């Protein structure tokens, strides 16, 4: 062995022992709703759990969210929707993601979503809906399980 060249036996941080890159999550507030406290709390919890978080800010269109997802090469998109526009925004976003070849991205929705709307959102491709009162730990665990490997 040449001196100074690390091997798996001499350097515990070689590629074979490194962890995979962090899960990349885009957190967005679509629509006209200006209440972003919940989205910021989720973004911080995900970051604290070791995920890489990109927060897009308020008043994002589905087009803006899809473009940001492509640019940032994210694994997960989290939407915070309190305005009642979920039945319009979510299907539009899912269509745009598919058109951009990003239909493997996990899309989550949090906010005030009537129970009657949940089946159609899941049918549109939303992976999970988190209602008010869901713990941040439950969201972190869902994402970690979905992206374990």
Locations of regions flagged by a protein language model:
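Short, flexible coil/linker segments at domain boundaries that flank nucleotide/cofactor-interacting
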Residues: 18-22, 102
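Intrinsic-disorder-associated, low-complexity terminal segments enriched in Asp/Asn/His/Tyr and depleted
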Residues: 11-13
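Intrinsic, low-complexity polybasic segments
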Residues: 3-4
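The C-terminal output helix
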Residues: 145-149
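Intrinsically disordered, low-complexity segments enriched in serine/threonine/proline/glycine
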Residues: 7-9
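Cofactor-cradling patches in redox/metallo enzymes
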Residues: 39-144
């Amino acid at each position: 062995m040449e001196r100074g060249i690390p091997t798996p036996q001499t350097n515990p941080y070689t590629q074979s022992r490194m962890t995979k890159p962090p899960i990349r999550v885009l957190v967005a507030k679509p629509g006209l709703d200006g209440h972003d406290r919940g989205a910021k709390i989720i973004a911080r919890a995900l970051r604290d759990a070791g995920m890489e978080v990109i927060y897009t800010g308020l008043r994002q269109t589905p087009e803006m969210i899809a473009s940001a997802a492509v640019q940032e090469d994210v694994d997960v998109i989290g939407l915070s929707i309190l305005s009642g526009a979920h039945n319009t925004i979510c299907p539009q976003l899912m269509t745009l993601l598919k058109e951009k070849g990003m239909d493997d991205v996990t899309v989550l929705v949090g906010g005030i979503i009537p129970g009657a709307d949940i089946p159609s959102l899941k049918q549109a491709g939303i992976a999970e809906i988190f209602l008010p009162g869901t713990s941040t730990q439950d969201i972190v665990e869902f994402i970690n399980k979905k992206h374990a490997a």
